[in-house]
Structure formats: structure tokens, C-alpha cells
Amino acid sequence: MQESKKPGRVSIPLSAVRRWNGGVLTSNGYVLDERRLGELVAVPEEERGDRAQLRARLQRDGYLFLAGLLDPAVVLAFREYYFGLTGPVADRASYRKVLFEEIVPGAEYAAFCAQPALKGWFEWFLGGEPFLHRRKIIRQTAPGENGIGTATQAHYDLVYLRGGSDHVLSAWIPLGDCPVSRGGLTYLEGSHHRVLEEEAAGRLKRPAASITADLPALATQYDANWLVTDYAAGDVVVHTAHTVHAALDNVSTELRLSTDIRYQRADDAIDNRWQNHWHDQDGL
């Protein structure tokens, strides 16, 4: 099978693209151009214990895909806890009450996000006391949900965190297996370099909003690939505040559940707006 190519990039083979939903990947209903797809690459095992190499990789790529960082049993236990509370609810209002009054501020969620395998990794990687922002987000996407605003649109996190350090790191954690068809996160290759340059030059002081829902057009604008992969329970992706990312549509038959949280050094500037529990009406 011949590979699809684009100048200066190496795309994944068409055979690999086609195993993901028959080669048709969408986000908010927009069909991604298979010529502008790449594979999100996990950090090799031999580099996992080398902090200098990891920092260099993060600076180069804008993300660290840490396959199997967490114990899958711990991840699946939290997933079971979540659906144990939300499963019985019959309407949207009841679901939101359970989510924002029980799960988000609950001890179980706090413990999951600060588990030793996660907090300890950030302490080691950051080289200092880690600080976990209280505003931690859980996202659920049902099969077949599509259209503008359903999947997370393309954005970079700094626009929501300008009140603190731009060295804050995000951790995206699939709460259960999340193959491409289930709507996992996708990263725009090398986008952080352009964002950093334009932010530094004062040309990109974007408001706290997404860039666009049109991922194909953004890939063309940046001359970059959208990076995708199949995630498994236990995987974590750490990315910088300047890395453009989005979510794919869930075209599977299962609910997609994930959480995204932020860690940084405790001695760096902290955005105080993120020190309350997340709510979808909190204005951030």
C-alpha cells in the first residue's frame, strides 16, 4: 500500500488510516484530510526514566504520550465509580447535579488526580513541589453526538490560563480504553512552536476561546498533521499550554470518558481562577 505524503512531513500509511473508522475521521462533523494525519508517538521505554530527554522531547514535540503510566485497574475503578453514580439518572438535570455536586468535588476524584503514579511523576519531571489546579474537568461524549460544539474544538490551553505561569502542563487521561473511533484527543503537530513565536511577538493574544471547529482548514493553515492514536486505560498525554489540540467525534458504540487536569511547580505563578471546582457555568 502506498503511503500518502505531504511536503516535509511523513504521514502514516493509508492502511493504518483506514483501520480507524474506514479512513474517515471527523471532528464536529468536519472530515479530516487523510493526507494531513500522523500517528501520536509514545515515549520509548528507554527514555521514560531520563528527565533531560523527556524535557527535550516535550520542547520539541509539545506533548509526551506516556503509555501505561497509570495502573489500568485504578483507571477502570474510577470509571466504574463514575458510571455507578451517573448511570441511574434519567435526565440531563439530574446528571449535572450528580456530576457537579458529587463527583467533581468528591474525594474519589481528588484522590484519582493526585494518585502517586501521577503526582509523583510530575514532582520528578518538574524537579520541585507539584501543584494540582483544583479546576479539573471530566468529559463524557455519547456515541453519535456530532455537529459544531459536540467535540472539543481546536485550542491551546494558555488562553484559559493567562493568570498564571505559561509553564503549566496539562494531563489528558482517558478513563478507559479510547480507540480513535471513540473520539480521543488529537494534536496538531508542531503547533506549539508557531503559537510560542506568535505569543512572544504579541500577534496572538487570543481571548479565552477555541480557535476553530474546522480541523482540516487549521491543518492546512499550519501546514501540519493532526496526530491520532488508539489510547488504552492507563495512558496519559502531557502537553504544554501552547500545543493546539482537539477531540475527534465519537463514532463508536461506547461512551467516551476522560479527564483533563493541570499540574505545575508550586513556586511558579498560579492562576487563582482555577482554584475552584470545575463547573460548566464557571465562565472559564
Show which residues each predicted segment covers.
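Double-stranded beta-helix
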Residues: 178-244, 268, 279
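Conserved double-stranded beta-helix
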Residues: 95-106, 118-188, 192-193
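Short conserved catalytic/interaction loops centered on acidic-Pro-aromatic/His motifs
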Residues: 185, 248-256, 271-275
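A short hydrophobic beta-strand segment most commonly corresponding to one strand
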Residues: 171-173, 189, 253-268
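Fe(II)/2-oxoglutarate
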Residues: 1-60
